[in-house]
């Protein structure tokens, strides 16, 4: 498969866009970061012990389908887990990343997001960390969320302002 952008600036060809490195990611915001699918799967995320299957009224299934599981295929799970694939900055510098977390998030808790930050720091990669104080998981969901008790206007908009400031600084 070849990359075919759905948008190109009027004055530039695809070749010119590529030559100017305009397709490169310049900065990234990671929200509700799933950085370690291997560890998550080992901790029963793909079983009924994960409350999300109950809430979704769905049958548990593996992230990678029926054939693969984290016990028999740890390398595959680690291959899709960013925390195991961070290059040293001397080999390849990643774009700056904003890692976001919420104080009361029990699904992607602050400590989990900070673990990814530690891994980035060990590889000398640039990142910033921001914690949305006294907020639950899913603070960016639109409208109001009954289970988390979030309201997008109260909880999401302040988070988006932090994210936009990050992009303004790096783009």
What is each residue range found by the language model?
Residues 5-10, 23, 65-68, 144-153:
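Surface-exposed intrinsically disordered loops and tails
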